[in-house]
Amino acid sequence: DGQGGFWPGIEKREVPDGASMDDYTLPQELLLPVAGPVTSGYGFRDNPVNGADDFHAGVDIAAAEGTPVAAAQSGQVVRTGYNRLRGYYIIIRHEGSVQTLYQHLSYIFVRGGETVTQGQTVAAVGSTGLVTGPHLHLEIILDGVRVDPMPSFPQLAA
């Protein structure tokens, strides 16, 4: 069929609505919120909690419980909250239709509506929600669509 890239007999998986595997360019540079190894990348994976084949809409960065989490860029806190999957989380809106989402936090130091600066400590790494251990789950949302954070943080690929 000329499409290539797929093994015969392997079914093509569709990226879920609200996510993209396409290349993108952000209007500003982002700061890595926490240093550590990537334990789960963006895209299709075997879920480490339940073994299901699913789409992971962010990257997981391992770090010790309580490690400070910095705002990737200046912006306004859209929402903070808790749910059983994300645990404690923060969404920050930045210029250029960019949002960053930080999940599985142990503590949140900011409130909805607050303005934050790049590098400001906004939370602490935790293991809340559906997790196997302490880490930061980080997502980048561009124009309402989740994109792979790895190209924005080349130090994660090292």
Residue ranges and their predicted role:
Residues 2-86:
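Surface-exposed, glycine-biased beta-strand/turn segments
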Residues 41, 80-81, 108, 125-128:
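Residue-level recognition of beta-strand microenvironments
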Residues 41-43, 64, 93-95, 105, ...:
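Generic beta-structure capping elements
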Residues 54-57, 71-109, 134-135, 139:
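Zn2+-dependent peptidoglycan hydrolase active-site motif and core
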Residues 68-78, 110-125:
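Short, well-structured beta-strand-loop connectors
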Residues 88-94, 101, 114-158:
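Conserved, short, structured surface segments that act as functional micro-motifs
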